């Protein structure tokens, strides 16, 4: 399930490694997209209120302000926001709130330089007619975080993951872990449009 060839970072495995390392009382928030699906599939929780997501509402940009609220409400618990490069840019200004309030929340930014879920649907259901899903002109996310006084790290290889997660979780203040992942990685299983849960696609045929 977590076997993946090559040196590239495999998002499901990274999130499983995060799940194994995070404190039992850790709160995880997500934005919307492939990272949201992977987080729901591969991060375990001890209580239902420890996973905060907008589910099927599709509210990109939800994850960071949700993490801010969770950290204010539970100042003694670890809060981790799982985001994607598309969603993160929707409410990136909330890094100002993180700095102003000195909130020690952590951000795992899974960056495939795509609107990944939209790209996957265009691949599977629209004959690979890709439109407005490429984000190769993303900003330098570490420089952006640094402008708000938030430290971070950028990783690109699977052998960097464990040490990077440990550094993030052990940091005293806010922290951004920028993770480059394969732009063509898909989420499985997937329910096609108009289908039922008994008609899930297990992989690309």
At which residue positions do the language-model features occur?
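Short gly/pro/ser/thr-enriched loop/turn and capping motifs at secondary-structure boundaries
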Residues: 36-37, 58-60, 88-89, 113-117, ...
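Glycine/aspartate-rich loop-and-adjacent alpha/beta segment that forms the canonical ThDP
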Residues: 143, 158-205
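Short acidic, glycine/serine/threonine-rich loops at helix termini
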Residues: 39-44, 63-65, 92-94, 117-122, ...
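Conserved thiamine diphosphate
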Residues: 73-164
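Short glycine/proline- and charge-enriched loop/turn segments
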Residues: 45-50, 121-129, 197-198
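Active-site diphosphate/adenylate-binding microenvironment
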Residues: 1-65, 70
């Amino acid at each position: 399930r977590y076997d993946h060839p090559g040196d590239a970072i495999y998002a499901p495995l990274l999130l499983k490694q995060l799940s194994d390392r995070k404190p039992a009382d850790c709160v995880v928030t997500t934005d919307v997209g492939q990272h949201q699906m992977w987080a729901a599939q591969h991060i375990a929780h001890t209580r239902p209120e420890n996973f905060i997501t907008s589910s099927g509402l599709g509210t990109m940009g939800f994850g960071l302000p949700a993490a801010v609220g969770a950290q204010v409400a539970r100042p003694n618990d670890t809060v981790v926001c799982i985001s994607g490069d598309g969603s993160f840019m929707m409410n990136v200004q909330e890094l100002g709130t993180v700095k102003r309030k000195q909130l020690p929340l952590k951000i795992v930014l899974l960056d495939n330089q795509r609107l990944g879920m939209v790209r996957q649907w265009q691949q599977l259901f629209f004959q690979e007619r890709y439109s407005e899903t490429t984000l190769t002109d993303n900003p330098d996310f570490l420089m952006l975080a640094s402008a708000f006084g938030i430290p971070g790290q950028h990783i690109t290889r699977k052998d960097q993951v464990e040490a990077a997660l440990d550094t993030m979780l052990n940091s005293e203040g806010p922290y951004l872990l920028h993770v480059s992942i394969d732009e063509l990685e898909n989420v499985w299983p997937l329910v096609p449009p108009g289908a039922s849960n008994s008609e899930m696609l297990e992989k690309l045929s």
